[in-house]
């Protein structure tokens, strides 16, 4: 059966994957302007794609001149036994990536969450603060691509250290934070403020797979890339790993490499149809492939296919 599966995903129109709206360019400029007020930078990224899609521009414009912590969030969605390999590979690629934490912002007792502030404080105290040496409070900037959990991290840290809720707006749609916000107090002693920032992608995504991996974990908005394309890439990844849990989920008889077959079967399994206007003005009833694609994508994002490190092929 595996011989029938694709071994390479076909190249798609790069325009579908290059999403850099105006607020991202403006946000990057605002972040650079606020750097003089910042003592430490925390970069948040999705643990499922630790080697894909990080904005390398941050290193040259934001994080390269300040103490830096890389937080790999949503660690509950990957096998914890792989964390060591992820760290080793990241440090092979970037000698500056010395401080890496894995977090789950939905769990306040998470060991990584507990380590964030002590580590940041240690890095700040051991650094040369230059123009901020006489400042008693600490200011930490939170950066990253869209929808990796930056605002969630701020909220869980604020709730943990101040026991207050409602620090920063959180949403499941990429790009909800659009401006560099005012300082958000998250600790009284020591006095610590965080700066939330908009998720910012590179203006040009490196390649098809990088873009689709970002899309699969919601760093790109689904409708801009196309739900059926994202579902097709998911099918490709699952087949490549021999993960056939989608067969039962989508009402199939056996694994397949055809996304059309998956979505038609899925819409029938879900009993979902859509009325489509025919060329002669009449309406015909067809399987709702879009809804089936959304169902399949949501199943992945909620863990129905198990814990998956999407970048596992980069460790070979």
Curated annotation (Swiss-Prot):
Recorded topology in the membrane: Peripheral membrane protein
Keywords assigned: GTP-binding, Membrane, Mitochondrion, Mitochondrion inner membrane, Nucleotide-binding, Transit peptide
Domain CP-type G: 28-203
Positions with a binding annotation for GTP: 73-76, 147-152, 199
GO cellular component, as recorded: mitochondrial inner membrane
Subcellular location: Mitochondrion inner membrane
Protein's GO biological process: mitochondrial translation
One Pfam assignment: MMR_HSR1
Chief subcellular location: mitochondrion
InterPro entries referenced in this protein's UniProt entry, alphabetically: G_CP_dom, GTP-bd, GTP-bd_ortho_bundle_sf, GTPase_MTG1, P-loop_NTPase
Coiled coil: none
PROSITE patterns attached to this UniProt entry: G_CP
GO molecular function annotation: GTP binding; GTPase activity
Entry function: Plays a role in the regulation of the mitochondrial ribosome assembly and of translational activity. Displays mitochondrial GTPase activity.
Family in the record: Belongs to the TRAFAC class YlqF/YawG GTPase family. MTG1 subfamily.
The protein's name: Mitochondrial GTPase 1
């Amino acid at each position: 059966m595996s011989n029938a599966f694709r071994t390479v995903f076909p190249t798609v129109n790069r325009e579908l994957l290059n999403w850099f709206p105006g607020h991202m360019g403006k946000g990057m400029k605002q972040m650079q302007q606020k750097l003089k007020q910042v003592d430490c930078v925390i970069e948040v990224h999705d643990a499922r794609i630790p080697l894909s899609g990080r904005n390398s521009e941050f290193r040259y414009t934001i994080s390269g001149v300040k103490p830096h912590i890389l937080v790999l969030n949503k660690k509950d969605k990957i096998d914890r036994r792989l964390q060591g390999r992820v760290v080793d590979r990241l440090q092979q690629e970037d000698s500056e990536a010395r401080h890496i934490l894995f977090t789950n912002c939905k769990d306040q007792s998470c060991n990584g969450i507990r380590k964030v502030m002590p580590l940041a404080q240690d890095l700040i105290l051991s650094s040369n603060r230059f123009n901020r040496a006489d400042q008693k409070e600490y200011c930490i900037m939170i950066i990253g691509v869209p929808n990796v959990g930056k605002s969630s991290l701020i909220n869980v840290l604020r709730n943990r250290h101040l026991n207050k809720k409602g620090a920063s707006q959180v949403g499941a749609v990429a790009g909800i934070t659009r401006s560099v916000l005012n300082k958000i107090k998250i600790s009284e002693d020591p006095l610590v403020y965080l700066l939330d920032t908009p998720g910012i992608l590179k203006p040009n995504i490196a390649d098809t797979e990088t873009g689709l991996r970002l899309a699969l974990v919601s760093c790109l908005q689904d409708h801009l890339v196309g739900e059926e394309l994202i579902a097709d890439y998911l099918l490709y990844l699952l087949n490549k790993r021999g993960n056939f849990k989608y067969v039962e989920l989508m009402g199939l008889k056996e694994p397949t490499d055809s996304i059309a077959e998956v979505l038609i079967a899925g819409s029938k399994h879900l009993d979902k149809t859509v009325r489509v206007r025919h060329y002669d003005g009449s309406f015909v009833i067809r399987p709702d492939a879009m809804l089936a694609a959304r169902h399949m994508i949501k199943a992945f994002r909620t863990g129905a296919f198990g814990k998956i490190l999407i970048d596992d092929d980069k460790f070979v």
